[in-house]
């Protein structure tokens, strides 16, 4: 199922004629079930090496979504944990870090916003020996800004990077997905974060 039930649009992601097979019951060890499935499919025992797509001739210049992604991927330490709620601004960081040092990437799986900073707190509390990087969009960061206080109070090893575009960029996309092609000034103002501007 898709995470939003858009009026007049299909919510099922799989084709209607697809046969859905249950791999394992809740009481079954999921790792064992996945291993047996991999054996049945003759899947490789080790994951494929991911090609490093990071440009090698990167030069300093204007900070953009693309250059931020390159910088993050180049400076990310081994075994980092990334809490990614960067919305429309963080795609380059995900793409370029795929071939970088070993790390874990935690990202939103549904349609809610506001989980990025609390997830970073949880990761840092659970894994105090690992660097946590919070990639956070400015709009969704406002939902749980109190997590910044918790990070400071608990002296957590979290690098927080705010991707600031002064907009609920992801909600603008969702507006178009429900068929609103020419939103009025009131609708646009609800998704604009520049009046007043956020001084992160």
Map each language-model feature to its residues.
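Phosphate/pyrophosphate-binding active-site segments
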Residues: 2-88, 186
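Thiamine diphosphate
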Residues: 25-36, 92-200
